[in-house]
Amino acid sequence: VPMKNDIRAVTVPGAVDGWLTLHERHGRLDLDTVFASAIHSAEDGFPVHPTLSATLHLIAAVEHADLPAAAPAGAVVTRPGSARALRAIARDGRAGFYEGEFGEGLLAAGPDEFVPADLATVQARWVEPIKVDAFGHQIWSVPPTSQGYLTLLSAAIADGIEFDDDGLGAHVLVEAAIQAGHDRPTELFDGADPVRLLDAERIADR
């Protein structure tokens, strides 16, 4: 799969489907209220964080980007495309996104990669969460194909190492994350067994 600048690297986005699935089961506010703050920021603007300012040049070659290719920290920028997408979701739910302007744009950008049926297929599903016990807490995430197991595995590995909270602990956490993810390309796939991925012996081997 190409890393960037290629429509084949793009998947049908499941996050919006996930938001709405959660909202249907647990939401108490209407979608207009839920998205109001985000729409306001996208339409009226928000200050550029220094980290964003330093990385904006990376989108200079991206067509139709709704962020400028350069802006100093503190400058106010808007994201009109994001605002339109959020308004469509608030107004029409799932159809507003997957069958609206965004979905049409995705089909136009990848006519050989996507068909309308791809966007009509429900992306979200309810699954059994996975967890580890680390640092005196239960830490939960979602199973593969999510990368959430990497967070759990990192925490479990780090929990097995004695280190002082002297500022150097960050290095331990980084190394734990590296150990957790070193075999991700071969271990993360549809149907991967989360119990095996978080097995105590596998954690100890790291």
List where the protein language model places each region.
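Short linear sequence signals and composition-biased patches located at protein termini or domain-edge surfaces
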Residues: 148-162
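Internal maturation/activation junctions in enzymes
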Residues: 163-206
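Short helix-capping/linker segments at secondary-structure and domain boundaries
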Residues: 24-29, 93-94, 158-165, 184-188
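Short alpha-helical scaffolding segments that buttress acidic/His motifs in well-ordered protein cores
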Residues: 38, 86, 154, 173-180
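Noncatalytic scaffold domains of N-terminal-nucleophile
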Residues: 1-99, 103-137, 143-146
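Short coil/turn linker and secondary-structure boundary residues
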Residues: 29, 77, 114, 161, ...
